[in-house]
Amino acid sequence: MSGPARTGVLLYAKDLALVSAFYERVLGARVVHSDPEHRVLQSPDVQLIVYAIPRQVAEGIVIGVPPVPRENQAIKPFFTVESLAVAETDVQQTGGRIWGPVWPGPGMKVRNVCDPEGNLLHLRETAA
């Protein structure tokens, strides 16, 4: 991709390195830009910007271990992965959590997971 992305997701994180590593692994994304305040991740499907919450705000945020899914969040992004089974392992190995069952969908199967800070996302595996 050349030039700025036309579409993407910006996500705030208390622990920039931890959250970035989660999405790098689960989405197979690579870091295309990094500085102390944010990381820009790129996969074939999406650009994800992980932005560090300012320290004075982050100090008041408590993140559970394992993470507590934020079921009341207003938006849940979805991402397509090659294999839900592989993604599930990656989620658990990078501090995330599996949330709920796998559901069949038209031409796909889907699963909810949360990242290490409790942000819910929807993973999709398309039918071969």
What are these regions (language model features)?
Residues 1-7, 29-80, 86-114, 125-128:
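Vicinal oxygen chelate
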Residues 120-123:
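Short glycine-/small-residue motifs
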